[in-house]
Design a protein with these regions (language model features):
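Catalytic cores of phosphodiester-bond-cleaving enzymes
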Residues: 1-2, 37-38, 44
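A short beta-strand-loop structural module common to alpha/beta enzyme folds
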Residues: 30-39
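N-terminal G-site helix/loop of the GST-like fold
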Residues: 8-31
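Flexible, glycine-rich phosphate/dinucleotide-binding loops
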Residues: 18, 38-40, 120
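Anionic-ligand binding patches
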Residues: 3-9, 23, 45-170
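Cofactor-binding loop segments of dinucleotide-utilizing enzymes, especially the Rossmann-like FAD-
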Residues: 14, 34, 116
Length: 170
């Protein structure tokens, strides 16, 4: 079932995972990726970081489409107080996954919905504790040789092949 909104919905992201979530909810939407500086600001907590980025992404698009609802989101993985970004190569992916192997880490996702024409901005952050099983060498090699790790925070996706490493989520 498709739900039609009076005002259009715009996803300020090119993320296939976010697109699939909206489609599975039966929503019609346009995709207009936002390009914002994603650098971590000094002294910024992980929660404030994803909150700011989700708002910045939504606002960057909402300024141009004042009568639309714009959804922005950002996800980061944090372990030992360190933010793990998106690995750019096999070495980075392997190092990230070795750091996560057999341990618990925290995933922060911020999301913002903005309609600048109505002066509406709502932002929230969800925090999840994820425990990985110990990753065997053959599993590691298999995973870093597929395309999945390279466009995801922490080098894995809970809804993808990386789910095989997850022991628990709370």
């Amino acid at each position: 079932m498709m739900i039609t909104l009076n005002a259009s919905l715009i996803l300020a992201s090119a993320s296939p995972r976010r697109q699939e979530l909206l489609r599975s909810a039966g929503l019609k939407f346009k995709i207009i990726p936002a390009h914002v500086n994603e650098d971590h600001l000094e002294g910024e907590t992980p929660s404030k970081h994803v909150r700011r980025l989700s708002r910045d992404k939504a606002m960057a698009i909402a300024r141009q489409y004042q009568h639309s609802w714009v959804l922005g989101a950002d996800t980061i993985v944090v372990i030992d107080g360190m933010i793990l970004g998106k690995p750019r190569n096999k070495t980075q992916a392997k190092n990230m996954l070795m750091k996560l192997s057999g341990r618990e880490h925290t995933v922060f996702t911020g999301f913002s919905i903005i309609n600048s024409g109505k002066s509406v901005c709502r932002t929230n952050v969800v925090q999840s504790a994820v425990r990985f099983k110990t990753i065997r060498r053959d599993e590691m090699n298999w995973y870093i040789n597929c395309a999945e790790p390279y466009d995801k925070a922490g080098g894995y996706a809970v809804q993808g092949k990386g789910a095989c490493f997850i022991k628990s989520i709370r």
